[in-house]
């Protein structure tokens, strides 16, 4: 529920910031989800990354205003979410974005902007052309399209295309510090983990987040 997520964000966002990492918060068809995320980031002094879905223009810019009010220093959009089955045919609609549309969004927020869901070198170059500060190489856990390659398979080619020109992050099955090391060796500048931190914050709150981060750093 949105209330449950709001409670999680209240614990997750400051706990991650205190552990020296940044929490990416989510978005959904229920507008309260993004509102709760923005509120949690605002309460943590802007130390979190609000991640918005590729909605229609009016919905998107209203959500961007909410995120701007939080004081967030970095924004993100999971561009591949346009293909999620649960967003199909909904109001508000979500869909793909052109380079020009992304450029307008990035110029509007006036802070570094990450585009999540990039799986090709061509997509990475388009993100760079749009003015993105970074990308997240991600297949959305395989939930957008069947048969997509693993992120580790496509990461080297993407790194060859844009390494040094923008920040390259990657997610997908990263569970240990050794996995982090592999991602860095394949060309990433950093990684994202979702499920382990969800488990940590539910099971141990801020202490769970701290211990997991400490464990990953030690393994790395």
What are these regions (language model features)?
Residues 198-209, 220:
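Short beta-alpha connecting loops at secondary-structure transitions
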Residues 17-23, 43-48, 106-112, 162-166:
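Short, surface-exposed connector motifs at secondary-structure boundaries
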Residues 18-56:
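A gly/proline- and charged-residue-enriched helix-loop-helix capping module
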Residues 7, 14-18:
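PLP-dependent amino-acid enzyme catalytic core
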Residues 214-220:
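N-terminal pre-core extensions flanking Radical SAM catalytic domains
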Residues 174:
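Short donor-sugar binding/catalytic loops of nucleotide-sugar-dependent glycosyltransferases
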């Amino acid at each position: 529920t949105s209330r449950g997520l709001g409670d999680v964000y209240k614990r997750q966002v400051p706990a991650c910031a205190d552990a020296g990492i940044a929490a990416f918060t989510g978005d959904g068809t229920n507008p309260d989800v993004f509102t709760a995320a923005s509120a949690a980031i605002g309460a943590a002094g802007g130390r979190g990354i609000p991640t918005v879905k590729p909605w229609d223009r009016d919905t998107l810019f209203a959500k961007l205003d909410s995120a701007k009010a939080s004081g967030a220093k970095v924004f993100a959009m999971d561009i591949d979410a346009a293909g999620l089955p649960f967003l199909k045919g909904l109001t508000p609609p979500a869909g793909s974005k052109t380079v020009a549309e992304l450029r307008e969004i990035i110029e509007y927020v006036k802070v570094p902007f990450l585009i999540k869901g990039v799986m090709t070198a061509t997509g990475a170059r388009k993100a760079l052309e749009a003015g993105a500060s970074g990308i997240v190489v991600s297949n959305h856990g395989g939930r957008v399209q069947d048969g997509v390659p693993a992120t580790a398979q496509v990461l080297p080619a993407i790194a060859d295309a844009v390494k040094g020109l923008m920040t390259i992050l990657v997610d997908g099955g990263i569970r240990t510090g050794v996995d982090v090391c592999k991602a860095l060796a394949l060309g990433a500048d950093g990684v994202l983990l979702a499920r382990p931190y969800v488990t940590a914050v539910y099971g141990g709150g801020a202490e769970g987040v701290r211990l997991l981060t400490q464990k990953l750093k030690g393994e790395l």
